[in-house]
Regions:
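Active-site-proximal, Lys/Arg-enriched surface segment
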Residues: 13, 40-112
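Short loop/turn segments at strand-loop or loop-helix junctions that form parts
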Residues: 69-72, 117-123, 184-185
């Protein structure tokens, strides 16, 4: 009961407190003390299940839905912040020092709306290197962690062109999802060879030239 009260108050305070929000300001503007907010923030909370219940009330069950994923850069200075590192900032168009979160949302295609379900902080490159993993491996691990809750909602995951890689697409397929995205600007597309076999020794010809996306050969 006490956690529920603090939880509701915290949501209200996040909407009304101007500028920076921390435990000191929560205690100043709220009815509970700073220590109370600190203690309750250490407790685990299933945000994904909570937001899925909210989505059930907002979106119609018969509507077409898809899962959206999108990493977001957060500006952050300092040296002791866990997993601070260099991440891509879409707004700046460059890699910047700070934090990154992996956002997971639920798209209602018929309502043209999206609701945030979960945000997971991305590990920095040093941590990933020590684990022998890449950032794409981390993204797949996050989706795998929540797949039991996401698959009943939708098997389609929508993402930008960064995720249009074989390793990521295959990883999603192994988890039971399908990726909806666009090809990267540097994609290497090839025509399949449709001619007759030569009968010569060696591996049969598989591809027949590179595709010029600005002038594709429609006869093939």
């Amino acid at each position: 009961k006490s956690f529920k009260t603090v939880f509701i108050e915290t949501l209200l305070l996040y909407m009304v407190i101007p500028r920076k929000i921390n435990f000191t300001r929560l205690g100043r503007y709220g009815t509970h003390c700073e220590q109370c907010f600190r203690q309750n923030f250490t407790k685990k909370f299933d945000w994904l299940s909570y937001n899925l219940l909210m989505a059930d009330r907002i979106f119609d069950k018969l509507d077409r839905k898809a899962i959206a994923i999108d990493p977001s850069y957060i500006s952050k200075s300092g040296k002791r912040t866990p997993w601070i590192g260099y991440f891509w900032s879409g707004c700046a168009g460059q890699v910047k020092r700070g934090l990154e979160i992996m956002g997971i949302g639920l798209i209602d295609i018929d309502k043209h709306d999206c609701m945030m379900l979960r945000a997971v902080q991305s590990a920095d490159t040093v941590t990933l290197a020590n684990r022998g993993a890449t950032l794409n491996d981390w993204y797949l691990k996050v989706i795998e962690q929540y797949k039991e809750q996401l698959l009943p909602v939708s098997k389609y995951i929508v993402a930008d062109a960064y995720f249009s890689k074989f390793s990521f697409t295959q990883g999603l397929h192994d988890l039971g999802f399908h990726l909806v995205s666009r090809l990267r600007d540097d994609s290497n597309l090839l025509y399949l060879y449709q001619g007759e076999k030569t009968g010569k020794k060696g591996r049969p010809k598989t591809f027949d030239g590179k595709i010029d996306v600005s002038n594709p050969d429609h006869s093939r």
